[in-house]
Amino acid sequence: MSDEETEQVEEQYEEEEEAQEEEVQEEAPEPEEVQEEEKPRPKLTAPKIPEGEKVDFDDIQKKRQNKDLMELQALIDSHFEARKKEEEELIALKERIEKRRAERAEQQRIRAEKERERQNRLAEEKARREEEDAKRRAEDDLKKKKALSSMGANYSSYLAKADQKRGKKQTAREMKKKILAERRKPLNIDHLSDDKLRDKAKELWDTLYQLETDKFEFGEKLKRQKYDITTLRSRIDQAQKHSKKAGATAKGKVGGRWK
């Protein structure tokens, strides 16, 4: 017998049982009424079984049990599958967290290393600049010492040569320069300390700078004066040319006729 036929027989059997139960409930006496005589019990009839076929109720029961077991097993499998999936997701989440933590630690390490390198580089550059500044100051001090040492000798020799050329034709300014050169003491800076020598060099440097500034201003003033003189001479020449032309025109025309 096939599964469909077995199910049909089973459903027919259940329907007949339900019909018999309903008949028994309808025929049952009400509790308030007392029946003196018992009514005959209804006769239960077995479900009709198709002729030529035999129904195996054990097989039906076994199939029901197998079906229930399969459904239960499916529920169990789905439960364990969902639990396994949750565990896998939890493991993956933990791995991502650990990976992110490791990446963050690596980034912090790289950032700290770069910061150390930057600080070391800044310190090296600062030390190099300080060394270069000290070297440059030492060179400047040495140049100033040489310039100051040679300044007096050069200035004195210059005045001596000028005196020899001019001889007795010295002006008041030349006499003043000569007197100042004679009164000027030689520059003795060997006994000075570094600080005093630096101050002395600064003082002389400021004086020299002021002299150069005055020289530049006098030169510019002289240029302006030369330019003014040249412009004035040019204007005078132009005026003289125009006056000569006007005089020649007046001489050539007499009585309304040309000579």
Swiss-Prot record:
GO cellular component: troponin complex
N-acetylserine sites (modified residues): 2
Residue span of region Disordered: 1-62, 101-180, 235-259
Record-listed Phosphotyrosine modification sites: 209
Domain of life where this protein originates: Eukaryota
Underlying gene: Tnnt3
Residue ranges, compositional bias (Basic and acidic residues): 50-62, 101-143, 171-180
UniProt xrefs under SUPFAM superfamilies: Troponin coil-coiled subunits
Official protein name in the record: Troponin T, fast skeletal muscle
Phosphoserine: residues bearing it: 2, 78, 149, 156-157, 193
A GO MF label: troponin I binding
Organism: Rattus norvegicus (Rat)
Sequence similarity: Belongs to the troponin T family.
Keyword DNA-binding: no
Keywords: Acetylation, Muscle protein, Phosphoprotein
Any matching Pfam family: Troponin
